[in-house]
């Protein structure tokens, strides 16, 4: 009888471990996509981690902005992105505040928008949050050109 009890105990223990594992895997698959909070932050430098040369195409900001009519060349004046963009894109500036320009460009036409389709349109690709304090900041990184 003791052997039967031990076998039954180990079968129940194995079943409990399997059930707990399945529960944790299911819970993990349902967690929200929050880079730096619930998943690894693949873009700690914000803009420059996404706007880069990829698949033979140049998505770096200096290349993309060269196609914007009237936009000055940024190659020499910008060292850190997006911090240095605030030289021209501050609140009240004729160029428009960076917050409006960036959000408009990243969220317009969501059905045909690379940021939405490839990066889940997640705020935390560009922003970081301190979960303890709730303080939100804009990620910044050295230019990549």
Residue locations for each model-derived region?
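Short sequence/structural segments immediately N-terminal
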Residues: 4-9, 17-145
């Amino acid at each position: 009888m003791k052997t039967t009890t031990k076998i039954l105990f180990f079968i129940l223990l194995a079943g409990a471990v399997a059930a707990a594992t399945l529960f944790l895997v299911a819970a993990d698959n349902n967690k929200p996509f929050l880079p730096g909070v619930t998943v690894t932050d693949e873009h700690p430098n914000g803009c420059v981690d996404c706007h880069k040369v990829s698949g033979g195409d140049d998505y770096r900001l200096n290349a993309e902005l060269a196609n914007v009519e009237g936009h000055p060349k940024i190659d020499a004046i910008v060292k850190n992105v997006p911090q240095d963009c605030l030289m021209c894109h501050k609140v009240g500036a004729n160029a428009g505040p960076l917050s409006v320009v960036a959000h408009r460009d990243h969220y317009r036409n969501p059905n045909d928008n690379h940021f939405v389709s490839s990066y889940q349109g997640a705020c935390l690709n560009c922003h970081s949050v301190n979960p303890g304090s709730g303080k939100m900041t804009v990620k910044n990184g050295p230019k990549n050109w």
